[in-house]
């Protein structure tokens, strides 16, 4: 709906009517915490509600939306040990596996590494590694946005941009990066103080694998159901040193894919 210009006035009025009563209720409200995925600029949604403090990229609150390694070790030691036992792994190897799969979020810089709490807690509850957060929703809108504006796929993990771009979204913009970042598929990897630029990338393997697997059928002639199998076959052929098998599969894979898209996927 956001990318459909004719619907913006409707969206603006709905959101403004939802938030504006908070201003009138100010004498009765001691603390209000607003959270969501996206803040849109130039929509005048918060015109009347002008006493909001945006802490999205404030360093003191960097870990407020996740679990740090220190917090996990201090408060979830028993869960880690039971999960390690169920996987027949050492505690140290279990921590490394959890970090690789679910850690790596940064909402500002500097920032501690933050685990995705939803995936971490589900892993402890089910005693099984899985893509729990990614499976709660699919990035269909993001992929459509990338295709609509011909965003180069190979640049998705090597993005350099500024803080204001990350902190709000211009509804008229053709850049999908702010939406992808604010939706949790990209995170801050580094910061250049001289130019005040942030480097973005995938936070962890759950997000990277999930996003690329979902992206693949939209850019190549492979169905969503077959893409995990194709990736597994590619990896297996590389590990076995089966060069002929790999090249044959690659040729078949890109037979019906436009040259520009094939080049983008190869760069990944």
Locations of regions flagged by a protein language model:
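Structural recognition of the conserved hydrophobic beta-strand(s) that form the central parallel beta-sheet
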Residues: 30-37
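A short, conserved structural fragment
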Residues: 184-191
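Conserved helicase/translocase motor-coupling segment
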Residues: 130-136, 144-179
